[in-house]
Amino acid sequence: MSRVCQVTGKRPAVGNNRSHAKNATKRRFLPNLQTHRFWVESEKRFVKLRLTAKGMRIIDKKGIETVLADMRARGENV
C-alpha cells in the first residue's frame, strides 16, 4: 500500500539526516497516515480512507460529502 494521503495527496519527501559533524545521510520524511472510517449519511455506509492528520482536519472543516465529491471528480475510487 502506497504511503499517499487520499485527501491531500501528500507523499513521502526526501531529505538528509545531519549528524553533529554535519555528515549527510539520506532519509525519508513520511506523512502522518491514519486509516479512518467515516459515516456517509447520504450513502448510508462507512467509507474507509487512508489519510493524514491534515486530511482529517480538512474533512472536519468541509464535511465528508464535499471531500468525497472532490475526490471522485479527481478520479479517485472511493
Curated annotation (Swiss-Prot):
Q: Which Pfam families does the annotation name?
A: Ribosomal_L28 (PF00830)
**Coiled-coil ranges per UniProt:** none
Q: Which SUPFAM superfamilies has this protein been placed in?
A: L28p-like
Gene Ontology process terms (BP):
translation
Q: Which UniProt keywords apply?
A: Ribonucleoprotein, Ribosomal protein
* One Gene Ontology cellular component: cytosolic large ribosomal subunit
Is Ubl conjugation one of the keywords? no
- Ribosomal protein listed as a keyword: yes
| Single Gene Ontology MF annotation | structural constituent of ribosome
Signal peptide region: none
Show the segment(s) annotated as Disordered: 1-25
Write down the PANTHER family for this protein, in alphabetical order: 39S RIBOSOMAL PROTEIN L28, MITOCHONDRIAL, LARGE RIBOSOMAL SUBUNIT PROTEIN BL28M
**What protein family does this chain belong to?**
Belongs to the bacterial ribosomal protein bL28 family.
Can you say what this protein is called?
Large ribosomal subunit protein bL28
Name the source organism.
Aliivibrio fischeri (strain ATCC 700601 / ES114)
